[in-house]
UniProtKB/Swiss-Prot annotation:
This is E3 ubiquitin-protein ligase SGIP1. E3 ubiquitin-protein ligase which triggers the ubiquitination and subsequent degradation of SGS3 in response to heat. Involved in the mechanisms necessary for quick response to heat and subsequent heritable transgenerational memory of heat acclimation (global warming) such as early flowering and attenuated immunity; this process includes epigenetic regulation as well as post-transcriptional gene silencing (PTGS). Its EC number is 2.3.2.27. GO terms for biological process: heat acclimation; proteasome-mediated ubiquitin-dependent protein catabolic process; protein ubiquitination; regulation of photoperiodism, flowering; regulation of siRNA processing; response to heat. GO terms for molecular function: ubiquitin protein ligase activity. The gene is SGIP1.
Amino acid sequence: MEKSQKQVTRPSNSRREYSKEIPIDLLIEIFSRLSTGDIARCRCVSKIWSSVPRLRDFTELFLKISSARPRILFTFLHNGMVPSYDNEIHAPVRGFLCSKASVYNPSTGECAYPYLELLGLWDILPVDAENLAKKVCVPKVLLASEDFACRVSTLGTEEVCWRMIQCSLPHRPFRDEICIDGVLYYLANCKGKLGILWPVPSGDQSHEVTRSFVLRILEDANKLIWSRTVYTLSFNWKKLVNKSLYIVGMTSGGEIVLSTRHLNYPFYIVYYNPVNNTAAKNEIQFGNIANKKAENSRIYTFIDHVENVEHMD
């Protein structure tokens, strides 16, 4: 009699033979709960995983979650350069930073240089029109006539195309610009309304906060009705932190944020509640970053920064 042969199943070294592919919807949900660093590492697992960060459903979900937990963003001038209009850094829009002739995404580490040859080029500003990221605006002052015009372009397209927009109110661009619902302003965002926030001058330090400052809010844009409130503090800022403080902006909750401007020890962020007339200070420790920067380096502080993993290409 022939001996019966037993069928032997060898254990496989590959788990893929026993596992099904993870549904893309589940991958999007998993990736949305990870940090940007973990997302970058997960891209090395497989081609499917590497494609998730480029899916629009994922980038919009990640941005939505990130918007619910805004952060403070600090930027430093390279090698302690002297601040000027050539290296001015503008407030981020949907996670994108803009400076002279460049757009940068801190979350992905990408940098774009949209080419535009213009005489009298002023700067590149971030624009968030119709919930579309990666739009940039270049205000240009025509030196001959002092007229003002803008050119708008969208990053990530095969060919960079600039669209000319004439401004009905000729003016020179201001530094502290913001974008609210696709409209470019040069003031402050006060709970979704246009606001002006400035300190009451004290001596030669016209931008330094001492004992009081003024907040004006555009309550009715059609009738140009502005509210005006003067906040007089019951204490001196220098006694609170023993340093000069400058206005950074206003949070979505209505708190006014102030900070020092240079990399000195200690570095403070102060949150002022105008309703209760109270302030809370937080010391920021930069660790090894501070050791690599020149003493007294200029620091740009931005509030309500959100992480955006959308790619520029």
